[in-house]
Every structure is written in structure tokens, then in C-alpha cells.
Amino acid sequence: MKRLIMLMVAAIVPLSAALAPTGADAAVHHGGDAASTVCSTLPVSAPPGAKIESVTAAAHAGGTVTFPDAPPLPTPAPITDVPAWCDITVTLTHPGANDHVNVKISLPRDPHKWTGRFQATGGSAYLAGDFGAPLVTAVKAGYVAAATDAGVGSSPIDVSGWALAPDGEVNTPLLKDFASRSLHDMAVVGKDVALKFYGSPVRYAYWNGCSTGGRQGFAEAQDHPGDFQGILADAPATDWDRFAVATLWSQVVFNEEKTYPTQCELEAFNTAAVKACDDLDGVKDGIIDDPASCHWDARRLVGVKVLCEGKEITITAADAEVVDKIWAGPVSPDGEKLWYGPNKGASFGYLAQVGVPFFVADNWVKYFVEKDPRFDTTTLTYRSFAQIFRRSQRDFNDVIGTGDPNLSAFRKAGGKLLSWHGQADELVPTQGSVDYRERVDRLMGGDKKVDDFYRLFLLPGVTHCGGGPGPQPTDALGALVQWVEKGQAPATLAAATTGADGRPVTRDVCRYPQVARYTGHGDPAAASSYRCVTT
């Protein structure tokens, strides 16, 4: 689940932090292996309901691959020891849709460097797929890799060029492409290109994505359960029709309560919450291990003085009321819970900046729900917010909701779904992943049966798609591969980071609903000093 341009205005947090990791389209190559397979265009079979418009090919020498600057995003780090590869770009259309969808497939040119695996990669915010670093990374690991632009271009933040049709209505064909149609097309085309390039079929197909890419992975499991044997879908923006409105909630609260705390004041509440709930796992490490069990109330900070920009400020009851409402998440005027807020401990820097609405939500409401680019989302009231929320559900759940808990067909196909979500995610509320998993549990026989094909891991102290003070996953895709190909289901997910003292910190993250607890002995920085328990 981005970028900014419109957000650049007052971002306290760098824009890059709001986006799933991406790379630029172009790459520069230095040296590399000699090619062993001819890189040229080949005949591509059109997916059902689509027509191939063009096929192009481009050979790359490999070696060290660098990427150009693409502000405001960070430049991806150079990737070394990349084998020579071939890019096949397929452009297709869906008759009557007036769309032009590009699918880029990257293939190791030496057949001996191909593992027989296919990896489709996901996007970020309103970017359906990244044609740069993710593909090169996958090629280095021996995959045939693919990405799609869904026909909506290469900007994760600007939907003005495609969201609305000339008549001012939502461009439904392109929204369908962005939501799910292009993902299935990519799977079909990517496997077909691999077969014709090597003369051998793909043995194992995987999805790999975070944020929007996570939502896309769940869309594939729900809508096209046979496309992938393994799906890695992290920090997923599922239930998009709700999430994409709910993340405006802080603006509504500020507007209605007429209280406008600074980021310094807001983060004082987070600091206090972390201090109060830090030792829930038995260790004081500056991280709330299980925010759902942190019942600290913002009102406890009322009257406390905090230093902000050299000035002493006293926290008021109005400040506390605003913070508690943001943490609780959106509700209707009659008190019905609509969706979730950020966890305690997650930064307020993106979802709660006064007068600066989260750009994903801002664009969604302006272009898709209201169909009016001039609509001001900072003026929403509790009542108008609830009305927009309901309209988004009514008009878009079937198109892009991605909240269907019925994964029966995916289970029957033998698929495996692995998802992790940071407990300090500042963009996509972690409880959305918990809500979805619990709906699947209720529908499909309980957590033990669901664990046979779908596992969720909640990572303490980890921010959106990685980052933050908590241990980061070391090889989630590798864990998924072991599950799919060897039948070794991950009981825990290995994670690691470097502590403030420079020492390595490791954790074996427990699968939901379990949480980690310190055993009372051993090095608190070592994974072996913790056990998984059900609270």
C-alpha cells in the first residue's frame, strides 16, 4: 500500500516511506555473462478476452545493474552478479475497453540459470507493477519475473490521467484492469512466454507483493485461484473499498473536533503508549509486541508537559480525545464501527497530518467516489464521511474490494498463502489483516484448518512493507517456497535487525494468533529466548 507529489507539501515523514519498495523502469548494466539464448520476439497467446497488440524484446548483459534516480522515490541500490537476461514486453487490449496493458517478462538468457520458477511482482499505491528492481532481483534469484502496468501508467500517486472517462464517469475498464484483470493476464502471458522461450513449462508459480501488491496477491487467491501455487502478500490493502476511505478518518476528527495537534504532540502519545505497553512480551525494547493487548488510554497524558520545537506544551483533554478517536478508527454517527485505525506505536506521520490527507485516500474519494478532482477531503464531517464510506462500499466492493473470505477454490487448487504485516504499519492498519484472517477462519472451519493453506504473521515494531525498529523478515519468499515445494509449513517466520547497541537481534515471529513471550532467561536479543503463546 506510495508516493506523493500532492503530499510533498507537508510531509514530516519522507515520501519514500509511504511506498512499497520499487525501482525505476530503466537500468544501466556494467559487464555480465555472455548470452546463451537468443533474445527476440516470439508468438504470444492472448489470454481469454484479450488481444495481443505488440511484442518487443530487449537483451541485457547483466553484471552490476544500477537504476536512475526517480524522485521523490529513493534510488534502488545496485544489484550485482545479475545473469544476462531478456525482457519481453507484451502489449494487450481487451476489445471494447479502449485499454493498452503492458506486461514485462524478464527471463535469464541461460536456461541453466532458470530454476523453473515464475514470479509475478506487485505494485504500490496506484502503481500496478514496477518494471525495474523487482524484476532484476527475481532474475538474479533464478526466476522468470513479470510485472504489469495494468494500462494505467507508471505513477503511484497520480490517477488524473486514467481514473475518469471523458464523460466524467469512472473509467470502469481501467479500474478493472488495475483491480484484478491485468493480474490474471500477466500470469497467463508470463507462463506462456517462459514456455516458448525455454521450451519447458513453468514448474512453480509465485506471487510476490506488498501494500497494493499485497492486495493484488489476495485478489489472485480469491478470483484466479489456479494462477499461483504460492502467494506472498504482505501489508495488504485488502478491503480496499473501506480502507481507501477509512484512512481519511483523522482529517474528519480534526475538522469535527476543531483540535489540531502537531506531529510532536501526537507522537508524545505514541511515546507514552510504547512506554506503558513495552514489556507485554516480558522485555523492554522500545516496541509494543502486541498492540491489540495495549489498553493504555490517551487521557492518561492529559496535563503532561511536552517539549515541541523548544516550547513547553501542556497536553489537553481535547488532544487526548482526538488521539483516542484516531486509534479507535472510523465510526458512523450512530457509533457503528466502520474500519480500523493505526495501532498504538505506529507513526501518525502519514495518516494524521493536519490538513494533509493521505494521498491514496484523497485520490480515491476525489476521483472514484465523488468523481470530482476539486473535492476537498479536509472538510468532511462525521456524517458526510459515513455517507462517502457507504458509497465506496456500494459502488466498488465488487470491483476492487478484495475482501472475499471464501478461499475454498484456492485451497482446493493446493495453493499456499503467506502474509505478514508490521504491527507498526503507519499506512495500512494492521487490524485489517487480522479482520480478514478471522473472517476466513469463521467461514472455513477455524484457524487450524485455515493454517493448512494460509498463514498470517504480525511483526512487532515493523512499519509499512518493512522498516522500523522491529526485526524484519529475512526470507519470507524462501519460507513460502519451502512450503509449496517441500511441504514445510512455516511455524514461525525468521526475522532479524541490528539493535541500537549495534548487536544483532533475531526473532522467530509467531504465526497469528500466537504472540511471543520472553522465557525469562537467555539473551533477550536472541530468538531462542522466546516462545509462542496464545493470549
Outline where the language-model segments fall.
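C-terminal subdomain of alpha/beta-hydrolase-fold enzymes, centered on the catalytic histidine
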Residues: 328-511, 516
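A catalytic-pocket lid/entrance helix-loop region that shapes and gates access to the active site
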Residues: 219-221, 226-331, 458
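Catalytic-loop region of hydrolases
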Residues: 4, 26-116, 132-133, 284-288, ...
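Cap/lid segment of the alpha/beta-hydrolase catalytic domain
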Residues: 74, 115, 124-199, 245, ...
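Short, solvent-exposed loop/turn and secondary-structure capping segments
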Residues: 99-103, 129-135, 150, 156-161, ...
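Glycine-rich nucleophile elbow surrounding the catalytic serine of serine-hydrolase chemistry
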Residues: 209-219
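Alpha/beta-hydrolase fold nucleophile elbow
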Residues: 200-211
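Secretory targeting and sorting signals
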Residues: 1-26
